[in-house]
């Protein structure tokens, strides 16, 4: 297994763990607006990467960041500044993929 494959496997496992945590929290405390926010971020990622030569690994990293951004925004009670900060956090990576 080469370095890229090891990195991809590690990130896939990390993503599974983050998603499991997110979905467990979702059952207990995350409401519809968080689900809507996740759909918006997901759409943003898809639009920015659909015509680019982004590897699966790059998309996976963005989706992991998206999940963490949703958790961050929820923990800050959907504060507008927290939302803007999270989107800016994701956006630089999206621009690199173009």
UniProtKB/Swiss-Prot annotation:
Family membership: Belongs to the rotavirus A NSP6 family.
Keyword Membrane: no
Name of this protein: Non-structural protein 6
Keywords, in A-Z order: Host cytoplasm, Host mitochondrion
Keyword Repeat: no
One GO term describing the cellular component: host cell mitochondrion
UniProt subcellular location: Host cytoplasm; Host mitochondrion
Pfam (any one): Rota_NS6
HAMAP family: ROTA_NSP6
UniProt signal peptide: none
Alphabetized InterPro entries for the sequence: Rotavirus_NSP6
Subunit details: Interacts with NSP2 and NSP5.
Highest taxon, organism lineage: Viruses
């Amino acid at each position: 297994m080469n370095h890229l494959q090891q990195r991809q496997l590690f990130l896939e496992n990390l993503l599974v763990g983050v998603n499991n945590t997110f979905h467990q929290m979702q059952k207990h405390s995350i409401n519809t607006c968080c689900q809507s926010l996740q759909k918006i971020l997901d759409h943003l990622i898809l639009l920015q990467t659909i015509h680019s030569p982004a590897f699966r690994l790059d998309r996976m990293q963005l989706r992991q960041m998206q999940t963490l951004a949703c958790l961050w925004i929820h923990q800050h009670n959907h504060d507008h500044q927290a939302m803007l900060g999270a989107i800016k956090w994701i956006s630089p990576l999206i621009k690199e993929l173009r």
